[in-house]
Amino acid sequence: MSMVDLLHFRDVYPTDLSTGYKRAVAIARALAAQPECILYDEPTTMVDPIMSDILIHLMLKLKHDLRLTAVVVTHDLDLMRRVADRVVFLYEGRAIYFGPVKDLEKCDHPHIREFLAMDRVEMVPGV
């Protein structure tokens, strides 16, 4: 619990925790088994931006402090860029790219180009 900075929640019932903190508790439970690898499945989906940032910082801390290999399943380009060194990009159940995150921009697969272009969509205020 201390490794994931949750000691102040030790007397709180799980039903009283937010979705984000429930995810942090799930990470703490997984770490109790001292794994060599951890799977994060859409770790920041459906949480507010502050909790998302807390979870991302936690993932980066564990990566650094424990040298823990992580597999992150996500559709969130920002999350991928912040936490991943390498990426496997799947399309129709097949890997169409495997390599450094920084080189993903150079990939010419149309589905990857489309995915990356979605990150550049400008939001119109009030719409």
Predicted ranges, named:
Residues 1-9:
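Conserved ABC ATPase "signature" region
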Residues 13-17, 21:
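Conserved ABC ATPase signature
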Residues 34:
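Conserved catalytic motifs of ABC-family nucleotide-binding domains
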Residues 38-41:
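Catalytic Walker B motif of ABC-type/P-loop ATPase nucleotide-binding domains
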Residues 74-75:
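H-loop/switch region of ABC-family ATPase nucleotide-binding domains
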Residues 80-82:
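A short, surface-exposed alpha-helical micro-motif characterized by mixed small hydrophobic
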